[in-house]
Design a protein with these regions (language model features):
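Sec-dependent bacterial lipoprotein signal peptides
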Residues: 1-3
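Aromatic- and charge-enriched surface segment that lines or borders ligand/interaction sites
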Residues: 81-131, 163
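Sec-exported extracytoplasmic/periplasmic mature domains
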Residues: 61, 65-69, 100, 117-125, ...
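N-terminal lobe/hinge region of extracytoplasmic solute-binding protein
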Residues: 35-86, 94, 202-209
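Gly/Pro-rich hinge or "lid" segments in bacterial periplasmic/extracellular proteins
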Residues: 69, 138, 148-151, 160, ...
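Bacterial signal peptide processing site
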Residues: 6-9
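Residue-level recognition of beta-strand termini and adjacent short loop/turns
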Residues: 86, 156-158
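Immediate post-signal peptide segment of exported/extracytoplasmic ligand-binding proteins
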Residues: 21-33, 205
Length: 211
């Protein structure tokens, strides 16, 4: 009678159409704890590359898009909509209104502009900088062939609009914008604390959780 005699079987709630036997009650203090498997090597989404690093980043940061939980298709994240030019080269992202960092500082398109340029800066030594090579001028800038960050195909014409120009049409580009390397970092915190900005007492994200 394993099924019929299981305690609380009839009271189990349904989650996404399936009966769930865990607890749906919020933990005390709304603190979420989970196992990473290993300690993150790095906590800077623009620099990191490890699996545990990425899981950590997804808890604290959010990019322009997210992934549909069933299809993995791009869905709105920090950008609530976007347009693509007819030639597939220009992506215009429109950020959600009133976005803020976890410390209450406004988050704007200029944060994405700063963050993506930072990933491509050779001095940052980002392990995943090549993921941005689809962007016009990105590879030459990252490899030191070109020196002018203003020549990159990145622009923030106003606080809520972020424009990306690609070197060539890239069908999977929207999928990339959900990857942690493309997530924004808080310029005001990075510049205030340098490499120490990812310490627990300094780290500020824009995602669902605070650390």
């Amino acid at each position: 009678c394993a099924a019929s005699c299981a305690p609380g079987m009839g009271d189990a709630p349904e989650v996404n159409g399936r009966r769930y036997f865990g607890s749906l009650a919020l933990p005390a203090g709304q603190v979420f704890r989970f196992a990473l498997g290993s300690e993150p090597e790095l906590r800077d989404p623009g620099i990191m590359s490890g699996q545990s690093d990425g899981r950590f980043a997804r808890m604290l940061f959010e990019g322009l898009t997210t992934a549909d939980e069933r299809t993995l298709e791009p869905r709105p994240g920090q950008a609530y909509r976007w347009e693509t030019s007819r030639d597939g080269l220009v992506y215009t992202f429109h950020l959600r209104p009133s976005l803020v960092w976890a410390d209450g500082t406004p988050l704007t398109a200029r944060d994405f502009l700063y963050s993506w340029r930072r990933v491509l800066d050779p001095a940052a030594a980002s392990r995943n900088a090549s993921l941005l090579y689809a962007i016009r001028g990105a590879e030459d800038y990252n490899k030191g062939v070109a020196q002018d960050a203003l020549a990159l195909g990145l622009a923030a014409p106003d606080d809520s609009t972020f424009v990306v120009t690609l070197a060539n049409p890239t069908a999977y580009f929207l999928f990339l914008t959900n990857y942690y390397t493309f997530m924004p970092v808080p310029r005001h915190v990075v510049e205030a604390w340098g490499q120490r900005w990812t310490l627990p007492k300094h780290l500020v994200g824009n995602g669902a959780f605070r650390w």
